[in-house]
Amino acid sequence: MAVGKNKKMGKKGAKKKVVDPFTRKEWYDIKAPSMFNVQHIGKTLVNRTQGTKIASEGLKGRVYEVSLGDLNNAESEFRKMRLICEDVQGRTCLTNFHGMRLTRDKLCSIVKKWHTLIEANVAVKTSDGYLLRLFCIGFTKKNARQLKKTSYAKSSKIRQIRAKMVEYMQKEVQGSDLKDVCHKLVPDSIGKDIEKACSYIYPLQDVCIRKVKILKKPKFEIGRLMEMHTDVSTFTSAEGEKIERPDDYEPPVQESV
């Protein structure tokens, strides 16, 4: 039997039509909480809504790591903030604080020889139900009149300093909500307070909160998220400007209403 050509079969090695994956994607703006100077920090891509796959659901839960220098327009910042997308309104992703850490180069630059490195960490719950774990780091410091090359602290002093670190981290976080905690982390006021409080035990330097992790979150509430994105200073009064006019001024007569 002669073998004929099957017209239904396609040609061997036929090229498939290449579809650009970016044609089915769309851009969304990323908005940071109002505690930072810069709110619009960038854009993100997601596949368009197709059938049961909704675009906004694909964005929720995304974590963005942004330099604090970009958020506050400051070049000298050495912290990285983690922001998580919790809600999507229109083409805008509303983010919330999700963590913080020091940059690698800063962490390497503060580590010194001939000094004692002291670390402490504690899990604390904020007043609005967020469970945070804070990591603190500090280094011993030479006295002004010290001739000795090294400045190592005794283990008893290290225990006292570590207890002081835990005490101050608990005190600063327990009575504050997440927004207040972020306001304290940006200038690192907690690290400065710890350094001052431990000065009578042993002189310290470069004390800072090196990392913050969110272990547990309360149930999501849109009202609480909107508070993070609302700045009281942005609202202005609705009063108009006063225009000086002569006493005999009469408004012009309109030809048609």
Curated annotation (Swiss-Prot):
Biased composition annotated in UniProt, kind: Basic and acidic residues: 239-248
Chief localisation class: cytoplasm
InterPro entries: Ribosomal_eS1, Ribosomal_eS1_CS, Ribosomal_eS1_euk
Region (Disordered): 236-257
Statement: the UniProt record of this protein carries the keyword Ribonucleoprotein: yes
Gene Ontology biological process: translation
GO molecular function: structural constituent of ribosome
Record keywords, A-Z: Cytoplasm, Ribonucleoprotein, Ribosomal protein
Superkingdom of source: Eukaryota
Pfam families hit by this protein: Ribosomal_S3Ae
Name of the featured protein: Small ribosomal subunit protein eS1
Species this protein is from: Brugia malayi (Filarial nematode worm)
Lineage of producing organism: Eukaryota, Metazoa, Ecdysozoa, Nematoda, Chromadorea
